[in-house]
Amino acid sequence: NVYPAEVENIIYRLPQVAEVAVIGVPDETWGEVGRAVAVLKVGQQISEAEIIEFCRQHIGRYKVPKSVVFVDKLPRNPAGKVVKGELRERFGAA
């Protein structure tokens, strides 16, 4: 099992990343793989490949997200918690 918070904590080490959430997406080979949904800090740039490579250097290969999607903001509920269900609806397709 891969715990999204563990992967998120690694990605948060990148100075360009303001927010990130990791969700599972269907995969024909593995059943499910990770996808990071990231918000960059204003004026910052980083590529999907750079985030994936950074993860490869810091966590086990099987935990590395297979893709990264960039968004302007993460959906949150009134308590301020990220609504991962909404992210899965928008970005959860393979």
Predicted regions and their residues:
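AMP-binding/adenylate-forming catalytic core of the ANL superfamily
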Residues: 1-63, 72-75, 80-90
